[in-house]
Amino acid sequence: MKMSNMLMLTLRESPAEAEIESHKLMLRSGMIRKMASGVYNYMPLGLKALKKVENIIREEMNAAGAQEFLASALLPSELWKESGRWEVFGPEMFKLKDRNEREFCLGPTHEEVFTDFARSEIKSYKQLPVNLYQIQTKYRDERRPRFGMIRSREFVMKDAYSFDKDNEGLDVSYNKMYEAYTKIFKRCNVSCSAVAADSGAMGGSGSAEFMVKSEIGEDEIAFCTECNYAANIEKAPAVPEKADKEELGELKKVETPHAKTIEELVEFFGVDSKKFVKTIIYRAENKVVAVMVRGDREVNETKVKNAVGSVDVELADEKTVKKATGAEVGFAGPIGLDVDYLLIDNEVTYMYNFIVGANETGYHYANANYDRDFKGTVGDFRNAVEGEKCPKCGKPLTIARGIEVGHIFKLGTKYSEAMKAYFVDENGESKPLIMGCYGIGVNRTMSAVVEQHHDDNGIVWPLSVAPYEVIVVPAVFKSEEQMKEAEKLYTELKKIGVDALLDDRNERAGVKFKDADLIGIPMRITVGKKISEGKVEFKCRNSEEVEVIDLDKVIARVEEEFEKNNLALK
């Protein structure tokens, strides 16, 4: 591509709306442009990079034995109601009606569609296993779109669905996808970790997320540097800290005027927050749930949802709290509580003589003890924290933030049973298909590349996903010799399969260099005054070194970079 014919949309300043580097640089380099909140148009340069990521995904999925498919993005509500998920996605699902008042949605994911296809077309074990994938636009009405393509309302996703006759087959399919994902992210030069995860609304038994560590990540990851254990904070088991044994004290009701929060109670009683147990009231659909955790801990709402079998939980309003406790917010406790579930974090059972709310405005109980004073469902209901014991090896955990770029699930029979997707096995028996689901956020992966590969001057694209691989820059537009040799070099590069740019614009060399750095082209060849000596300058974007080499050796130098990156020329 000659840049004189190219739509160059570079900006010298970052738009005020952009908060993170990938968003700033994708806007500044002219990769994307905002159309509405969470909705972006891809400019030619950005689309070219996106397609490079898609092609890597496609190659690895095909190599793993998956077959490409393309489903409709406009989905009838009947399928979602059949699976029981029409309401689960709630306000995130874009719902609409046609002129005949028939309900549809814009697909946020496609389990129902692929299950519907499978029940119509897969009848026998002889057709199994099968793995189908698509690369398609998805739609989710995010409450707070932010960070450019990291959390948008319209995004490109690769989603795959495997169908097997038994769980052993599912394990094989799942492991193939795990390996394919590892290869995909390695080829894209994205440094990420596979972590244990909760299946959430997707359902099923096993799940892993591919997470990129980032300070702006919306997920928290618990990981151990000793044994390589890693899990999303939603999934990570919290190992209880056992308090020193004490003689059980007499339960006492204490007046605590104007002391509602843990901070206020710590000041009032003059003891550490570890001596308090807070009781937090939630609504889980039509049920009221109370959760007890130590005063310095946080409730893990995902664990609570799983414990009560609810698709969603939310903090109860004042009216619900008043009905459950008989008191204002801030005085809830386990003794005399009127709720459907009382969930007690297992750490509480190792505590002695702690302080809880008395279910009476202005009062708390001192010297409360589990079993003697109250009982409930004991389990793990809190978030793991920095420094606590790894559940695998016992060494201290580290907590970091991360961006999810991929997620794989063992769905089992959740959808096939709900939608009656059955096949006939070797013995002539009808059985539900065993399913797996595997997603990659294509836009997110592209953004993650930019987050991990940039400097003060712009994007530093890895060669594998760069929109263009080499840029040829004649330093002086008015120099016939420089322009002629640059054109010849550009033509030679294209002949051997290099995705090349020729900056033939009537601009100063400094402007051309700045644009080349901003858009992140991996290799730059400058045809300058040394061309009269048969020499050009060669520079890699990820290095400060400028090499002066013979013109007749520059093609070989480009080929060398492809070999270093294990890439074949087309």
Swiss-Prot record:
Its EC number is 6.1.1.15. It catalyses: tRNA(Pro) + L-proline + ATP = L-prolyl-tRNA(Pro) + AMP + diphosphate. Its main location: cytoplasm. It holds the Pfam family tRNA-synt_2b. The gene is proS. The keyword DNA repair does not apply. PANTHER family: MITOCHONDRIAL RIBOSOME PROTEIN L39/PROLYL-TRNA LIGASE FAMILY MEMBER, PROLINE--TRNA LIGASE. This is Proline--tRNA ligase.
